[in-house]
Each structure stands twice: as C-alpha cells, then as structure tokens.
Amino acid sequence: MKIKLLIVLIINSLVFAIDNNILVEINDRVITKNDFIIRSEYTIRPSYCKSNNQIHKKIILNSLIAEKLLAIEIEDYISEENFSDNFLNGIKEQYMRDYLLKDVVYSKIDINPMVIEKYLENSLKVYDLYFISIPSEPVANSINMLLAQGIEFEDICRDYLNLKGIPEIKMDFFYEKDPAIHESIFLNSLSKDQVIGPVLAKDNKHLFIKVKDFVYSPLITSNEISSHTNMVNQKLYELTQVKEYDIYIKEIMKDYSVVFNSDVFVKLASEAYNYYIDRNNLINDQVLSSSLIFSKRDSINYYDEIFTLNGNSYNVSYLDNLISKHPLVFRNQNISRKEFGMQFKYALVDLIRDERLNEIAYKNNYDINDDVLKDYRIFSDATSSKLHLEALLKNNNFSLDQFNQNPESIIDNYLNQYIDSLQASYSDNIKINFNLLNEIELTDIDLYAYKKGVPYPMVVPVFPVLTNKSVIDYGKEVNF
C-alpha cells in the first residue's frame, strides 16, 4: 500500500483555517466540516471507511462522535493531580506560537504589486548556476575584492580556493526556500556569465553565484498563465513569511545572550548523537520522536549548568523540563557526526527561541484564545479518548497489542455495543447537520500530513478506530 506524504509548512494557511460550519455539537464540543475533512484526509483511515460513499462517511462521523463521547465520559476523572501530559502542554504552546505569529507577523504581509510583476517576468527562467558557499566572512570579503578587480570567477575557485571542480545546480523559480538567495536570482533579470554575491544565506554562509546558462519557457494558454501567476504569488507569500518571521525573531531576541557551558554541552551533544544515530529516534529526519532525558544519563549531573541566558544560570534539569514538552528539532536532515555539535546547538537555541515566543503568547493571553483552544481540544479529546479506550480494554482483559493487531474483532464483539450505549445516553445532547455531511466530498487516497520544523509535526491526531457502524439512530437533526 502506498501512502502519500503531504508536507504542510507551519506557515501554511491550513494551520489557521477558520471554519464556522458546525457539523456536530455535543455539549460544549463541536465537530466542524473542516475537522471532519482533515481528520479523514490527513491521516490514514481504516479500510472499512476509506471511501466517499454515504455509508463510509457515516462511519467516519460515528467514529469522531465516539471519540468525543469517550473524552467527555472520562474528563471528570482527569485532573492535574492524577494526569499530567507534556505532549498536550507542548501541543497547546505550539498552537499558541502559531496564532501569535499569524496575528503579529503573517497577517500584516502585503507584497508590492510592482515587485510581483518583476518576479513574474523572471519566473519562467530555469538557470544553470555555478556557486560557492563560504563560511568565513573575511574569506568572502577577499573573494568580493578579487571579483571587483576583474579576476574571473573560475580563476578564483581554482587558484585561490583550490577547488578541483565548481559546484553546479539547476534552479527554477519554485526550487529555492531561502528568501535572500531566491531574491538575488529572480528579482532582477540575470544574464549569462553574470556573477552575483556575496549573498548571506540563512545558514550564515556567503554565496557567490555565476550564471552558466538559462532557458526561458514562455506560457501559451490563458489557463497556463493564470495557474502560473497564482503559483508565483503563493511562492512569494511563503518566502515573505520566512523573511518577516526572521525579522520578528531577531527583534524579540535582540537583548538575549546565550552562553553554553562547553564541558557539559559536549557531554549532552554526545548523548544526543548516540540517541539519534543508534536508536534512529527521528520523525521525518528532523524531530526527536520522544524526549531525551539528559539527567538520567550516568555521565551527566542533574544540577550541571548547561547554559546562561542573560547572565542567569540554567541547569540540565531545566533543559529536560523544556524538552519534555518540546522535543528537539534539528534544522538539517542527515546530520554527520562532524556537524552534529553545531546542529545540536542550533536545536537548543531554537528551543530557547520558542520558549521566548511562549512567554510573549502567555503575556497576550493566547492560552485562552478561542482558536488555540479549539485546535488544542481536538488533540486533548483524542488523548482523553485513548486513555478511556485503554482502560476499557484492560478492564475487559484485552491488551493494547491485541487491539492494534485485530481492532475489528474487538470492535465487533465489544466496542460497538459500548459506543451504542454512550450514543443513547448522550442522544439528547447530540446535534447533527446531515445536510452538511451530505455535501462533504472525500478522497480515497492514503495521506499522512505533517508540518516541517516544529516539535509536533502531526497536523491531526490518528484516526479514532472505535466503531465500524454506519447507523446513526441517535441525536437531533439540525441546521446550525
């Protein structure tokens, strides 16, 4: 079975989808049309409800309602005293950061139409480029001086940098993700043999680029032109989001100074590398799949200072607490041992950055923001429902492994009946918009959607495997 991966950037509009089309209301819980679609489309559905027909859509709806009912049934027994979930705390804070950035950064983006026109003129070119990436600023300055003196790009690469070959890349308008690099190539028209640079990239390396050649492919039909224009606008918006995000982060972190304790840092980096390589504990090659608790390692003391922030000391215990709710995220994929120390440092700096964003979000009451709470409720109800399910299985002498291996057997012999009893019990409190359900169209393609570069990459919880019944003989039919 092929599963398609749908990558959703954190800045993508999906994260901020506002949906007032209520499909189901149960007490204070709601399931919207958008909830139904993303819970169905952005994770893997069981075979018994993969299609778009009415029977399968009703099974999906029953499953989502069952998840809410299980969560409601158990919520009175859950408190901070008997249940603390760092995963849910982390999910909530991730949504808080998302909506903070949406409001203070992304919603204010307005790209000049004249700038868009300049990009459109160059967006149909595909370049063959030579490039060199220089980590050292003094070396980059020297190269810039040599170019200013009229020395050829190739001669600099051969005689001054001792390169045996010059790296090459083919680049179209939609390839590059670094705003500075993209702007240097596509904002203005470039000619063959033109050299540009130094361009300061996001990884703080200095790029020099020479145009080897390019191909211009004009569009013919009005549909091609319209589609391409929309794609260019979307690409420019995404690049501008990255640029404005960087500006905002630079502003809020300008008075923050982090100094790492080198001895302790080396120990932690070694432990993190072993955890990453030996256990392969990365999701999508970037996010650690579970919290690495440094203070439980024999070589590390719980109270060792790992860094100072603005002169204040923070120990390994503090770092563990942060990581427990915010798994480390690495900027790069396929990290070698040689570069792991630097990538580990970046991951810690990004962790501190996100904690600063959390501080601003809490200060501005994003912990009680309606949109944050709605999105968080999807994950919290899914988690509570899972706790309820595990308790049910245990009380009826089923193991979780048994259920995962053959869920339909347990659903048929036990769970359907239990879910039926909850549906009957809450029937007067359940309102369903069947007209809206009938309008929904689904695909039968297996997709797994995730966001890149965040501690919790899943867009939605896994599909709730709780019932395979399509009959809806409970609740009240309404049009919200």
How would you label these PLM feature ranges?
Residues 3-14:
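Sec-dependent N-terminal signal peptides
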Residues 20-43, 69, 74, 120, ...:
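FKBP-type peptidyl-prolyl cis-trans isomerase
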Residues 32-40, 56-61, 65, 70, ...:
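Stable alpha-helical elements in mature extracytoplasmic
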Residues 100-130, 145-149, 398-440:
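Acidic/polar surface patches and capping/hinge elements
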Residues 214-223, 246-306, 325-327:
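Extracytoplasmic and endomembrane cell-envelope/extracellular-matrix remodeling and assembly machinery
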